[in-house]
Each structure stands twice: as C-alpha cells, then as structure tokens.
C-alpha cells in the first residue's frame, strides 16, 4: 500500500482523516441526486409528451434501483473485505477479492440484461406502468438495460477505490459521468430530438464513461487495490463471504421499493391522493437524509475496515465515535428544520396550500424520531464495515420487513385516525430498531477490547 494512503488511514488524526474522506463521499451523493433531477427536468420538458414521458421513466426507477442493489450485493461486502486485508498487509489476497468481485459483477450484468430484454415489459407493468406510460417506460428500459454492465462496474468497482481512502478519485468518477449525462441529455433530447430513448442513451454512455475511468484507475499503479486480468475469475472462498457481507446493504436497497409500495397502497386507502402526494414530499426529504448519512458512512468505512485489519482497535473506536456523533448531528439538524418549519420545507416541493398544510401535519408524525435515526445508520453500516455480516443482515430484516411493513398495514386498524396510523409506522419502527441496534453494537464495541 502506498505510504500516502497508509498514513491517511493508519496515522493521520481521525477528525482530519474522516473529513478528508467523508466530504468527497457526501459530494458524490449530492452529484448523483443533482444529475438525476436534471435528467428528469429534460424528460419532463419533451414537447407534447413530457408529462407521460416523465411518468413512464418514473416507473423504471424501482427497476433501476433493484438492478443497482445487485452491485451493492457484491461491492458493499467486497470493498470492506479488501480494506481489512490491506490493513493486514495481505495485498495480493485483497487484489484477488477485487478480481472475483469483478467476475461476479460481469456475470450479474449478463443475467440482468437477458432478464430485462426478455421480460422488461411485464416487469414494468407489474411496477405500475399504464397503457399511456408503458411505451415510454419500455423504450427507456430497453436502451438502459444495454448498459447494465457499465452500471454494475461503475457502482461495484468504485467502492473499491473508496475502500482505499481515495474518495476524491471515486467522486471524480461520479462527477465525470454526471457531466457527460447532462451534456448528452441536452444534445440527444433537445438537439437531436430523440426523446426518452435519448435520455436512456445519455445514461448508458455516461455510465460507460464512469466505468472506463474506474477500471483505468484500478488497473494503474496509483491504485493500492489492483484489478488484474488473471484474478477476474470465480473464487468461492473469497466471493461468498463478500456476498454474505453485502447482503445487508443490498436488502436495504431492494426493500425500499417494497416499503414505498406499502406506504402508497395504505395511504391511498386511508388518506386518498393528498396523502400519497404528501408521502412523495416526505420521501424527498428523506432523500436528503440518505444523501448525507451514507456519505458520512462511506467516509468512515475505509478507516474502520483498514484499522480493524491492522488490529488498531483504539483507532477503530475513535472513528466510530466520530461517525456516530456526525450522523446524530446530521439527522438532528434535518429533524429540527422539519419540526420547526414544516410548511417551509413542504413549500419547496409544492405551492398547493392544501398539500402544504397536510404535509406539515404528516411531517410532524412521520419524521418524529428522525433525530435518533443517525444511531441506526452509524451502527448498522459499521457492522458491515467491521465484517459482522449476520448482525447487519438481521438488523435490515428486523427494521423493514419484521417491523415497518407490518406496522404500515396494522396501525390503521387500531389507531383512531387511520391515515395517522400509517404515518406512525415509521417513527415506531425507528424507535424499536434503535433500541435493538444500539445495545447490539455496544456489546460488539466492548468486545473489541
């Protein structure tokens, strides 16, 4: 490992190292959100069909998130494993982890592409496409799936750059793809008038740009983790532990769709269109939370994993304490803004007075326990970074599948105001989850010595 990287992860004061790693990681999350918004702006302004085109592309979002979850399955377990091996000084074995994870990402890309080409239309109909939106959704997805390999390699392998403590490089790879996407959107949608197909091709090419940059870096001498052609092969002894560790982050992404469908279905029944619209605004607020907190976690992950491998336990503990304080501060800040100025927050997303009033009410309920959500994020993701796969998987299943989804459907039947009962599912699940996660992590923290 290069002296510069080793010094950053093993010797530099924790606050300075954490900031140096976390700021680019948060910036990368912000860039992703920004270019997704710009993408939708271009699509929404397609002459005469903008509304239907935007709705059609919106239907593809859960499918695209599901595809991305498979990259997380491989990389979010493989990257911490590789970082731990770097900390132990087992560089050759760490390179083999990169190789076998690349092999798996390529295999998943092939399988997902075949599935989407063969069954894309019925899958989109299952996710809510209508007779008006299915032509746009199918067109977009038909092109997008051709670039699945680029998406998998960009998301999957960029994590191995972050794992070295090179978050500025990984942010640059994301930024280059985002810039290419915006330029190509303008050219293909507004210039050549390719419509939704143009937006899809812009996404494919931009992901290709990012993938090339990621691969070039990992193959270069600047990278502490090297992608070597001879290592791109199946190695079950290395791959399966990575998959097990990555199961928790992948489940987090996959279950987001199920949670969203559950909320929308229940709110439509008990609150009508205004409740569903309000939920859309609340989800947008949570996007900002999930922009900040995972960025902080990505900054801490290399420090946690590398120093665990090096058995520098005091440094592991200091990193976690700083991560916990940062996540708590971030979640508290957003909670405070939402609790004190809910109308102002809602008005960012709509100018409808009735919807602003309703969202101000629902925001106080839905985000009531957001102030402690930072504990859940810091502990759960740290379990992944510290190679505690079974606990991380349990906590993911516990919060979303065992607690949240059943509560969404149960509480409306026992609460006087059924719609309020639906919104209450979130803070109740958050509270129980934190009360479970915090003691589990405290016990592990003490066991480190």
Which residues does each predicted region cover?
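Short alpha-helical transmembrane segments in multi-pass integral membrane proteins
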Residues: 1-24, 82-149, 191-247, 304-369, ...
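N-terminal transmembrane alpha-helices
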Residues: 10-41, 45-49, 62-81, 106-113, ...
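Residue-level signal for transmembrane alpha-helical positions in Major Facilitator Superfamily
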Residues: 19, 34-35, 74, 115-119, ...
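Transmembrane helical elements of multi-pass membrane transporters/channels
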Residues: 20-39, 143, 177, 206-210, ...
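Helix-terminus/linker motif at the lipid-water interface of multi-pass membrane proteins
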Residues: 30, 34-55, 124-131, 187-194, ...
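Small-residue hotspots at the loop-to-helix junctions and early N-terminal turns
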Residues: 51-62, 137-141, 200, 273-288, ...
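Small-residue-rich hydrophobic transmembrane alpha-helices
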Residues: 54-114, 151-170, 278-336, 340-342, ...
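Short runs within selected transmembrane alpha-helices of multi-pass transporters and secretion channels
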Residues: 144-162, 170-178, 199-214, 294-297, ...
């Amino acid at each position: 490992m290069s002296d510069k990287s080793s010094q950053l992860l093993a010797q530099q004061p924790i606050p300075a190292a954490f900031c140096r790693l976390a700021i680019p990681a948060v910036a990368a999350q912000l860039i992703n959100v920004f270019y997704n918004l710009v993408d939708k702006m271009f699509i929404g302004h397609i002459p005469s069909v903008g509304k239907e085109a935007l709705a059609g592309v919106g239907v593809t979002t859960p499918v695209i998130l599901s595809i991305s979850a498979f990259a997380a399955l491989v990389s979010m377990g493989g990257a911490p494993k590789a970082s731990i091996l770097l900390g132990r000084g087992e560089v050759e074995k760490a390179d083999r982890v990169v190789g076998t994870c690349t092999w798996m990402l390529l295999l998943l890309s092939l399988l997902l592409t075949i599935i989407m080409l063969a069954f894309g239309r019925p899958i989109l109909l299952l996710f809510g496409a209508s007779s008006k939106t299915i032509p746009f959704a199918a067109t977009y997805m038909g092109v997008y799936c051709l670039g699945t390999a680029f998406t998998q390699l960009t998301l999957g392998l960029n994590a191995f750059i972050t794992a070295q403590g090179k978050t500025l490089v990984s942010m640059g790879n994301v930024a280059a793809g985002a810039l290419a996407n915006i330029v190509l959107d303008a050219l293909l949608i507004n210039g050549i008038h390719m419509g939704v197909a143009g937006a899809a091709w812009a996404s494919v090419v931009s992901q290709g740009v990012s993938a090339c940059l990621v691969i070039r870096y990992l193959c270069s001498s600047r990278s502490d983790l090297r992608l070597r052609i001879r290592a791109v092969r199946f190695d079950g002894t290395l791959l399966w532990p990575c998959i097990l560790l990555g199961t928790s982050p992948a489940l987090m992404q996959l279950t987001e769709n199920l949670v969203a469908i559950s909320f929308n279905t229940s709110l439509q029944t008990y609150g009508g269109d205004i409740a569903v619209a309000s939920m859309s605004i609340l989800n947008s607020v949570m996007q900002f939370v999930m922009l900040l907190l995972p960025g902080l976690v990505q900054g801490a992950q290399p420090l946690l994993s590398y120093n665990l491998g090096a058995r520098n336990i005091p440094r592991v503990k200091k990193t976690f304490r700083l991560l916990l304080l940062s996540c708590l501060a971030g979640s508290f800040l957003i909670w405070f803004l939402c609790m004190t100025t809910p109308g102002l927050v809602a008005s960012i997303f709509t100018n409808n007075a009735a919807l602003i009033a309703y969202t101000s009410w629902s925001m106080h309920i839905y985000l009531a326990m957001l102030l402690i959500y930072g504990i859940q994020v810091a502990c759960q993701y740290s379990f992944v970074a510290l190679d505690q796969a079974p606990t991380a998987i349990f906590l993911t299943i516990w919060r979303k599948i065992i607690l949240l989804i059943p509560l969404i459907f149960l509480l409306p039947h026992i609460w006087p105001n059924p719609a309020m009962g639906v919104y209450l599912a979130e803070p109740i699940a958050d509270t129980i989850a934190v009360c479970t996660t915090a003691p589990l992590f405290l016990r592990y923290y003490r066991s480190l010595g």
